[in-house]
Amino acid sequence: MALQIPSLLLSAAVVVLMVLSSPRTEGGNSERHFVVQFKGECYYTNGTQRIRLVTRYIYNREEYVRYDSDVGEYRAVTELGRPDAEYWNSQPEILERTRAEVDTACRHNYEGPETSTSLRRLEQPNVAISLSRTEALNHHNTLVCSVTDFYPAKIKVRWFRNGQEETVGVSSTQLIRNGDWTFQVLVMLEMTPHQGEVYTCHVEHPSLKSPITVEWRAQSESARSKMLSGIGGCVLGVIFLGLGLFIRHRSQKGPRGPPPAGLLQ
């Protein structure tokens, strides 16, 4: 990918070289250095396509004129920059070229040549449901939907009970930054679970082709114990079945050795 440099940056660099290479005044005992600087800054808003370009012109460490793409024209920062700002704003070609540098410089350098449609990194969320307290059925409780490690920040999390959206008793934390550009959020639902009810956390995010749905089913302790016992029994059954087949296979092979003498005649 070729790095694009705003055209006015090259002009500023030429000015710097001309100023620094100017001959020393004859008869002077010391040199005076004048430095003109140009800074091009691109600002990217997380999770959006919005890009802002700011170009700053600096003379001897003092900014004197600036272009801000949100403003759309040059503005003098000091009186020194007023003539330049007025002149550049009066030249349609200069303004058009500078405005285009939001795409030709900022967007180009961020996206690269392989894509022109996606400015943002996408990370799919991980979703899990937990119960805040271990309580029996028919007692007030809180379900917590943990949505973690997603980017960008825009996300929609909803709760459903038996297929119907729940809006009462729903609360959420603020978005939490993980420090690696990804986010996490907790969305809580206050409820009183009853036997057989199904609660669903429904998550929509730009990284997903279809929403993520995670279910939690209200079960009594006895039903949960029976289910776990059944799962454990199935696992043990598979283990013993495999062991029995292995032993049978080994026993069918029999000892290896030469055939009986009668078969050799």
UniProtKB/Swiss-Prot annotation:
Extracellular side of membrane: 28-226
Disulphide-bridged cysteine pairs: 42-106, 145-201
Residue ranges of the TM segments: 227-247
SMART domains for the chain: IGc1, MHC_II_beta
Gene3D superfamilies per UniProt: Class II Histocompatibility Antigen, M Beta Chain, Chain B, domain 1 (3.10.320.10), Immunoglobulins (2.60.40.10)
MF term (GO), any: peptide antigen binding
Species: Mus musculus (Mouse)
Residue segments, region Connecting peptide: 217-226
UniProt record, GO biological process: adaptive immune response; antigen processing and presentation; antigen processing and presentation of exogenous peptide antigen via MHC class II; antigen processing and presentation of peptide antigen; immune response
Gene (name only): H2-Ab1
Keywords, comma-separated and alphabetical: Adaptive immunity, Disulfide bond, Glycoprotein, Immunity, Membrane, MHC II, Signal, Transmembrane, Transmembrane helix, Ubl conjugation
Annotated region described as Beta-1, given as residue ranges: 28-122
Keyword set includes Signal: yes
Similarity annotation: Belongs to the MHC class II family.
Name of the protein in question: H-2 class II histocompatibility antigen, A-D beta chain
Record membrane topology: Single-pass type I membrane protein
GO (cellular component) term, any one: membrane
Cytoplasmic compartment residues: 248-265
Region feature (Beta-2): 123-216
Glycosylation sites: 46
Signal sequence coordinates: 1-27
Keyword Signal: yes
Chief localization: membrane
Domain Ig-like C1-type: 125-213
Post-translational modification: Ubiquitinated in immature dendritic cells leading to down-regulation of MHC class II.
Protein's cellular compartments: Membrane
